[in-house]
């Protein structure tokens, strides 16, 4: 009977190990491919079979669906209940549990309506958008267009921010540019951005916003850069820390950085819900020339305005977001 020598045994085991690794790698690749394909297919089915047909219906009918959605979020799923309650208690330590529960339920109700409004955005007409979502003082922004200046519009995930993206190019004389973050589901990102950009707004992301701004500023094309600056910073060491809602909080400071680079006016806009499906945008100037202010002054003013907005009507902010994922209790105030 033939026996393998020591060297042959070693080579045999080594080859066997390599083959096993290749087999496992290929198996994992196939699993990932199947999962990715299923994810894409399910996203498309969700859009074409459910979301798009729903979006064609009048909002008066769609809002009827928001009530069962609210019941599911609140009583069946208890959607992110712990995160919402913790965020509210940290932000408003004087609230008792009864008040927290009341605001949580109001948030679920608002969040259900917001989901319906986002679905409607897919097929909403220009006329309907501008009838339901209007700026009370567009002249404050348009005066900078007349001066040939771009502007940075700072806001947050408060009330309906998606309709602002949709209508941005129609609200003001500037070319509207919404700055956002990538979605993990690329198919969903492509579909939702197609809806967002139907009426002229351009959507860019953190990885190409510098190129887009450079193009517009170099070619003197006045643009309104809409940036939601209340997100949790992905890099804690590169953020602005402020005392916000009773705690030290980190903020993305890209808005101020972009404004300073090109010395652009910075404005804050607040979205106010006047009634169901109708919103008003109030704009105010933070500064006309960032170069005249000390570093961090724009971000500080923004955090103060945002806090006032949230305190005026707490249920309309995005409380289900893990806003305080990073601990800044030992960090110094200001730019990190």
Model regions and ranges:
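N-terminal amphipathic/basic-hydrophobic helices that include classical n-h-c signal peptides
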Residues: 1-38
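Non-catalytic C-terminal accessory region of glycerolipid acyltransferases
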Residues: 102-105, 143, 207-336
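Catalytic core of membrane glycerolipid acyltransferases/transacylases, capturing the structured
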Residues: 147-207, 234-244
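Membrane-anchoring hydrophobic helices of lipid-metabolizing enzymes
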Residues: 26-155, 190, 194, 200
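Short amphipathic alpha-helical segments and helix-helix/interface helices
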Residues: 138-142, 165-169, 189-193, 213-214, ...
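Residue-level recognition of alpha-helix initiation/capping sites
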Residues: 79, 135, 159, 186-187, ...
């Amino acid at each position: 009977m033939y026996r393998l020598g020591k060297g042959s045994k070693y080579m045999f085991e080594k080859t066997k190990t390599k083959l096993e690794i290749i087999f496992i790698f290929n198996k994992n690749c196939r699993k990932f491919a199947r999962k990715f394909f299923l994810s894409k297919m399910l996203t498309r089915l969700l859009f074409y079979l459910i979301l798009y047909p729903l979006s064609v219906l009048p909002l008066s009918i769609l809002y009827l669906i928001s009530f069962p959605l609210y019941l599911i979020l609140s009583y069946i799923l208890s959607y992110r209940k712990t995160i919402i309650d913790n965020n509210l208690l940290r932000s408003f330590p004087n609230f008792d549990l009864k008040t927290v529960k009341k605001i949580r339920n109001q948030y679920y109700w608002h969040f259900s309506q917001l989901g319906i409004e986002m679905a409607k955005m897919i097929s909403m007409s220009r006329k309907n958008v501008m009838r339901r979502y209007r700026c009370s003082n567009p002249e404050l922004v348009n005066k900078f267009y007349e001066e040939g200046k771009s502007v940075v519009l700072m806001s947050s995930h408060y009330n309906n921010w998606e309709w602002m993206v949709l209508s941005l190019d129609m609200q003001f004389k500037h070319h509207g540019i919404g700055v956002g973050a990538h979605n993990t589901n690329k198919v969903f990102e492509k579909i939702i951005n197609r809806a967002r950009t139907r009426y002229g707004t351009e959507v860019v992301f953190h990885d190409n916003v510098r190129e887009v701004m450079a193009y517009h500023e170099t070619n003197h094309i006045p643009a309104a850069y809409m940036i939601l600056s209340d997100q949790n910073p992905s890099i804690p060491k590169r953020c602005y820390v402020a005392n916000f809602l009773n705690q030290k909080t980190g903020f993305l400071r890209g808005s101020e950085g972009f404004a300073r680079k090109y010395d652009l006016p910075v404005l804050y806009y607040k979205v106010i819900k006047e009634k169901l499906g109708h919103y008003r945008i109030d704009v105010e100037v933070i500064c006309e020339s960032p170069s005249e202010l000390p570093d961090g002054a724009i971000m500080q003013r923004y955090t103060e305005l945002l806090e006032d907005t949230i305190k005026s009507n707490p249920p309309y902010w995005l409380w289900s977001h893990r806003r305080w994922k990073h601990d800044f209790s030992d960090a110094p105030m200001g730019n990190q």
